[in-house]
Amino acid sequence: MDLSGNEKSRPWKKANVSSSTISDIQMTNGENLESGSPTRTEVLSPRLDDGSVDSSSSLYSGSEHGNQAEIQKELSALFSNMSLPGNDRRPDEYILVRQTGQDAFTGIAKGNLDHMPTKAEFNACCRLYRDGAGNYYPPPLAFDKISVPAQLEETWGMMEAKERNKLRFQYKLDVWNHAHADMGITGTEIFYQTDKNIKLDRNYKLRPEDRYVQTERYGRREIQKRYQHELQAGSLLPDIMIKTPKNDIHFVYRFAGDNYANKQFSEFEHTVKRRYGGETEIKLKSKSGIMHDSKYLESWERGSADIRFAEFVGENRAHNRQFPTATVNMGQQPDGQGGLTRDRHVSVEFLMQSAPNSPWAQALKKGELWDRVQLLARDGNRYLSPHRLEYSDPEHFTELMNRVGLPASMGRQSHAASIKFEKFDAQAAVIVINGPELRDIHDLSPENLQNVSTKDVIVADRNENGQRTGTYTSVAEYERLQLRLPADAAGVLGEAADKYSRDFVRPEPASRPISDSRRIYESRPRSQSVNSF
C-alpha cells in the first residue's frame, strides 16, 4: 500500500507479530479467521570484530598492543549493556492504524514496529496515543486534552478572547511538538480541521443526516464531528480494539445478529481473555473517536462497558422496558377544594388509541399541551421535555414524535426561565409506573407499593445547585451510576440521599495522552490511575 502517495510503504511489523481486523474472535458462526503467531523479538548484541581496528596503527603498536585488547573489551561490554535513549518508555505508548481495505484495518504498537516510519507514513496513519488509564486518543482529541497551566491561564485572563485562544494554541502546540520528539514521532499533523462543506444545525451540532459514517458490511456508526481527514482523526476506527499482552492489535466490528446479540459484554470479554490471556485489554470506541478501556469505563460508571457494547448494534439496556415512550400530564388540575390534583402522566400512545377524539388527544395533535409532555430518552431510563430531547438527540426525537403522533414543533417551544423553574418545582418528586400511566407515588395504595421495585420508580432530578431540571431518571439508574438521590425524593422514598453514592470512589485522574515532559509548570507526581495502568 502506498501510504504517502510518493513512496512505497514497507512492512512495519516485526516478523510473526499478529495484527488484523477481526482476529479469531468469532462474531459469526462461519469461518474462523486464524491470527498470526505470537510476537517474537530477536535480541541482537552489538560486538566489535577483533579485526576491525588496524593493529599496525602506530597508536596501538608495540608495547601498547595489550591496551588495544583491553579497550576493545571495555567498549564491547559497554555497548552490549548500554540502554538506548527512551528505553524506559512504554512499547505501547502509541499505536499506528492503517486502513487496508473496506472495513479492514491494521494496527501496530510502537514496540512491534519493524522500522521507524517516515514522516509521511506517520501522517498517513491514525496515530493513537495512550493515556494513564489505558485509553487511546486520535490526534485531534489528544491535542484537545493538553492542559494549560493555571498560572498561564491567569496571566492571560485579561486579554481579548482571540489573543487568549492564540496563546493557548501556541502553548499546546509547543507541548505537542516536544512530546512527539520524546516519542520519536516525526509526523506531527493534528488533523483537527473539520469538513467545511458540512453545515451545523442551529445548536452548532451536526444535523442528524451528517452524524454517521457508513461501513460496507456493518451498518452506520454515529460520530460527533466531521473531519476533513476522517481516518487520521479516528472517525473510521472499528468498534472494538483488542491489545494482547504482547501488544498485538486486533479490531472487531459488531453487527446485527452476531454471536453476541443480546449478550452481555462480560461474555465477549471472557472469550477474548480466554484466547489471548487475562491481561488482554479491550478498548471500546466512543462517538468522539476515543478508544476507551473497558476497565476505565467501569471504574466511572458500573455497567457502562456493556451499554456501549450494546449501542454498537442498537441494543437497549433499559432497566424497565414497560415505560411509555411519551406521556402527557393530566394532573395539576383544580380538585374542587382549592388545590390541584396530583401528577398523572398518561401514555400518549394509549390516549391516541383509546380516545383519539378526546379534547386531550386533539390538543396534542395541534401541538398544544407541549409543556405537559415528557419523552423517553434513547437509553430508556430518563424522561425529558420535547425541547430538551430535540436538542440532545434530534434523530431519536424525530423518530419518537412520528411514532406516537405528536408534532415536531413541540421541540421548539419553551417558557421563560422563571416560568420554567416554577413549573419544575410543582412536579412530583417521585413517580411510579402503573400500567399505561405514571402516578405520583402518594396515589398508590400500601398494597400496590409492596410490589414496586427500583425499576418501576423515577425521581425528579436536580442539578448541582439543587434546582429541578425538568427531567426524571429511573431509581435503578441512580443505583447503577452510584448517584446521590435528590433530598426531596429520598425523603419520599424513606431512604438516605447517599444510599447509592456513599460507596463510590472517584478514580484518580489519569495522566493525559500528551503532556509536557519538561514539567516546567507542573511538578506534582501522579499516583497510579485506574487498574495501575
UniProtKB/Swiss-Prot annotation:
InterPro entries to which the protein is assigned, alphabetical: VirE2 (IPR009868)
One GO MF term attached to the UniProt entry: DNA binding
GO cellular component assignments: extracellular region; host cell nucleus
Keywords: Crown gall tumor, DNA-binding, Host nucleus, Plasmid, Secreted, Virulence
Pfam family name, one: VirE2
Subcellular location: Secreted; Host nucleus
Inducing stimuli: Targeted to degradation by the host proteasome by VBF and Agrobacterium virF in SCF(VBF) and SCF(COI1) E3 ubiquitin ligase complexes after mediating T-DNA translocation to the nucleus.
Chief localization: secreted
NCBIfam families noted in UniProt: PRK13868.1 (NF010442)
Subunit structure: Forms heterodimers with the chaperone protein virE1 that prevent virE2 anarchic homopolymerization. Interacts with A.thaliana VIP1 that mediates its translocation to the host nucleus, and with host (e.g. A.thaliana and N.benthamiana) VIP2 that promotes T-DNA integration into the host genome. Forms a complex made of VirE2, host VIP1 and VIP2, and single-stranded DNA (ssDNA). Forms a complex made of virE2 and host (e.g. A.thaliana) proteins VIP1 and VBF.
UniProt protein name: Single-strand DNA-binding protein
